[in-house]
Amino acid sequence: MILVTCDDGIESPGLRAAVRAVLPLGDVIVSAPCEQQTGAGRSLPTFNDGAIHEVEYEVDGHRVPAYAIHGSPAQAVLYALVELVPYRPVLCVSGINFGANVGSGVTASGTVGAALEAADQGVPAMAVSLETDKKYHYNHSEEVDFSAATHFTRCLAARMLVRQMPADVDLLKVEVPCDATPHTPWRVTRLSRQRYFRALPTGRRSLAEKRRLDYEMVIDHATLEPDSDIQALLVERVVAVTPLSLDLTSRVALEELEAQLR
């Protein structure tokens, strides 16, 4: 069984594209937030009531068991694993997200957060995002073409089902350019240390005025790592496949750091 989720919510065309990608690979179950949860990261908020609603879900003539969760993307995964699936899934696919998730800000991504939660529960996982214009980041536009992202989701999911990942690879983060085709090359990258999404001042006239943070996307080409996800996706225009680990420990020599701190 393959579990599919998406932080953009149960109505997202990207979620439907992910389901379409993995339908030929095995039984599929969908568990996704009932509403848009972009930026939720791996959060497990206590204010969500956890209600679960079974929904009618059909993709290409196939009826798929699907559930809308009053919760975050990570909670949608947890509810699926403890209450909805009859046995442990062999794979969790989170996506396909509207907009790239690259650089140092990926911990804020609900797409990545859901995949991290699945991985922490022992389920191999992948988080898939499609680069889109900023205007599509928070909506369910049917204008966005997910066909190439669907292709790469299917190809990489198929590989994950038959090939065991190395011990330190808990999930794959897949970034697909907006102009990709099934013939676009892909390569394995590292996570850039650059902050791609940068917050902007709200322009509020008083602190009490209600304003949401806006953001811009910025690349510092002078310091951009040549083997990074940002370089591959946004400069070279290839699909970036980044192995991520649940182990967030710094790669510094621990003995040296301890000596420095004492």
Locate predicted features.
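Hydrophobic/aromatic beta-strand patches that form the interior of the parallel beta-sheet core
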Residues: 29-31, 67, 93, 124-128, ...
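Alpha-helix C-terminal capping segments
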Residues: 80-86, 113-124
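Short acidic, Gly/Ser-rich segments with clustered Asp/Glu that frequently serve as metal-coordination loops
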Residues: 8-13, 206-208
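Electrostatically charged, flexible surface regions
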Residues: 144-262
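A cross-family phosphate/adenosyl-ligand binding-site feature
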Residues: 2, 18-83, 87-88
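Short acidic, glycine-rich surface-loop motifs adjacent to enzyme active sites
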Residues: 90-99
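Glycine-rich phosphate/pyrophosphate-binding loops
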Residues: 119-141
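Glycine/threonine-rich flexible loop motifs
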Residues: 100-109
